[in-house]
């Protein structure tokens, strides 16, 4: 096949491209420049699209003896990922920019360009597995559970999955991937992993939000409406947060308090005891299917597990898909700190079967 390999400059994408070539594919490499200010990003930065990353991507392609190009996707990334990130926080929601990037940049814009240029598939260094099942392609967790990225890939949908290659999905550990790079003499074999939001180079998410959304003083109140502190912008807080509250009045029982919610209209943050974060029902919208629409799993006929943050816990549940794309989940065990805006992925075993965006999480009344 004619394969377009996305090279980020890291070890994972370099090894994935090498494996694709060694599998007999005709591989061309591309580095996606996602930052409009790449030259300002210093070497060793924690952010994306540093000069060092672009240089490492070019070096990897040269060592693998494959053609290399740089595609400027900064405008698309800014509009669909960064602006979405800011807009979601303006609404008091908790977005996952990696999900949006995969949806709009890596597996939409990149795939569209690849298809127009006659490529048969796109290859990346993501940790996930694409398996051909009885009814078509399926997305499964990677064998290396610690690095599994199926959660942020489920938004792709089945059609996009038909034209991707994830060579690293079968590896049991990241150390094995680094060993593959070392065997091939790739110098990025020891390059550290990146865990932060890629466009926030210093890792200071609150500072980034403040610089773009500004500051506005507001109240922090308890569940009875009593003021217990102040803040400089309700958008800076997410459900379940405990650190950084700086409450002026301790709770009567002396217990720690957590963010229970925000009211963006009144710029108010509500805090309370940890047990008030517990929920047993979730409503999500804009469902993306990775299975057949009539799959009985989506009508509550099988126990599934839910994941609502990257590398988060798996929660047993039953789910019900409605005709308008709304997904209702009834949790078989309560969970906590579920925020609107997060991506909800439904798994049957290690297979992802549906993704949707959380609108509401709540505690059902007894007998409901």
Model segments located where?
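ATP-dependent adenylation/nucleotidyltransferase module used to activate substrates
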Residues: 1-155, 174-176, 182
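AMP-forming adenylation/ATP pyrophosphatase catalytic core
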Residues: 11, 123-368
């Amino acid at each position: 096949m004619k394969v377009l390999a996305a090279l980020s400059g890291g070890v994972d994408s370099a090894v994935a491209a090498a494996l694709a070539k060694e599998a007999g594919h005709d591989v061309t490499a591309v580095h996606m420049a996602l930052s409009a200010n790449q030259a300002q990003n210093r070497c060793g930065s924690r952010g994306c699209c540093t000069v060092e990353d672009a240089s490492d991507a070019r070096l990897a392609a040269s060592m693998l003896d494959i053609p290399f190009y740089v595609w400027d996707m900064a405008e698309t990334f800014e509009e669909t990922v960064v602006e979405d990130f800011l807009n979601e926080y303006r609404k008091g929601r908790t977005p996952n920019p990696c999900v949006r990037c995969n949806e709009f940049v890596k597996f939409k814009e990149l795939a569209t360009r690849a298809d127009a240029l006659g490529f048969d598939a796109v290859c990346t260094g993501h940790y996930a597995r694409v398996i051909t099942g009885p009814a078509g392609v399926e997305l499964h967790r990677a064998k290396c559970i610690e690095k599994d990225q199926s959660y942020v890939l489920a938004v792709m949908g089945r059609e996009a999955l038909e034209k991707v290659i994830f060579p690293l999905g079968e590896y049991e550990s990241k150390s094995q991937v680094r060993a593959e790079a070392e065997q091939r003499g790739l110098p990025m074999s020891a390059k550290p992993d990146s865990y932060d939001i890629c466009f926030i180079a210093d890792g200071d998410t609150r500072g980034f939000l403040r610089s773009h959304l500004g500051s506005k003083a507001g109240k922090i109140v308890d569940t009875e409406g009593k003021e217990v502190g102040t803040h400089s912008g309700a958008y800076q807080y997410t459900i379940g947060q405990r650190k950084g509250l700086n409450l002026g009045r301790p709770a009567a029982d002396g217990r720690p308090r957590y963010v229970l919610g925000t009211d963006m209209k009144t710029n108010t943050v509500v805090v309370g005891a940890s047990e008030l974060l517990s929920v047993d029902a979730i409503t999500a919208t804009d469902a993306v299917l990775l299975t057949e629409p009539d799959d009985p799993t989506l009508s509550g006929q099988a126990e599934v597990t839910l994941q609502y943050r990257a590398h988060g816990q798996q929660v047993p549940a039953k789910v019900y898909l409605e005709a308008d794309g709304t997904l209702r989940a009834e949790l078989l065990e309560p969970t906590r700190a579920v925020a609107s805006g997060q991506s909800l992925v439904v798994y049957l075993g290690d297979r992802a079967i549906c993704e949707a965006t959380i609108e509401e999480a709540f505690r059902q009344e007894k007998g409901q």
